[in-house]
């Protein structure tokens, strides 16, 4: 299992050794993971292709696709979904059989939404307070881009959470759903899997929680270095 953001690239810039790293990874079963809810697996494949690296779509798991799979397993078909997120996330949720709505939802899904507004926040809060399930793609408060730090999906989740009594189910790293899907895709026991990432709080903590060996890439280390999430291996990147 390999994190994409900060390990393979940052924004639209490939990190040194990208193609060599993926050639090495391809000698074993692998899956690439990202908490970026603005991409589907197909988008991830296209992005890597632009950087000169070709991977099969079956080897990419984005949090948009993982969230759609989670909803399909947790809710009846045609459930009403209020999605605050990108076109990729909305398309994935609709593809999972959910009906996209703007209010009075059965489930509220929060991802990275650059069009987030007071009105959309209001409808999300009203739906959750009326009993809708509350699902977050991730709790990452910020994203690293070529231009610096920008608010992540977790910042928007926090805005809704501040107004409701319901704790959201988080699908993405470091939570269990996405890691369990990745382990299932690999068809291996967790103890046979190496999780490579640059984020102590999501990649390393989540990989360890599922039972994988963890490796920290120093290419873009994030997280609380003084915390309890210590990797088994460390690479300079």
Mark where each language-model region is.
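Conserved phosphoryl-transfer catalytic core
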Residues: 28
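Asp-based, Mg2+/Mn2+-dependent phosphohydrolase catalytic module
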Residues: 2-24, 37-61, 65-237
């Amino acid at each position: 299992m390999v994190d994409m953001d900060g390990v393979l690239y940052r924004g639209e810039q490939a990190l040194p050794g990208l193609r060599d790293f993926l050639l090495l990874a391809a000698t074993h079963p692998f899956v690439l993971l990202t908490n970026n809810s603005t991409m589907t697996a197909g988008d991830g494949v296209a992005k890597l292709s632009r950087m000169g690296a070709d991977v099969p779509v079956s080897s990419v798991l984005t949090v948009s696709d993982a969230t759609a799979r989670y909803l399909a397993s947790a809710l009846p078909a045609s459930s009403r979904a209020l999605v605050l997120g990108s076109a990729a996330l909305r398309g994935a949720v609709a593809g999972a059989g959910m009906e996209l709505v703007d209010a009075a939802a059965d489930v509220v899904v929060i991802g990275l939404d650059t069009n987030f507004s007071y009105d959309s926040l209001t409808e999300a809060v009203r739906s959750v307070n009326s009993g809708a399930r509350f699902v977050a793609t991730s709790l990452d408060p910020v994203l690293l881009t070529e231009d610096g730090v920008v608010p992540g999906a977790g910042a928007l989740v926090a805005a809704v959470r501040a107004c409701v009594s319901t704790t959201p189910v988080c699908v993405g790293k470091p939570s269990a759903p996405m890691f369990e899907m990745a382990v299932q895709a690999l068809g291996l026991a967790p103890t046979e899997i190496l999780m490579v990432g640059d984020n102590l709080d999501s990649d390393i903590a989540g990989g360890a929680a599922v039972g994988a060996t963890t490796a920290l890439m120093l290419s873009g280390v994030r997280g609380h270095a003084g915390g309890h999430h210590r990797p088994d291996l460390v690479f300079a990147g």
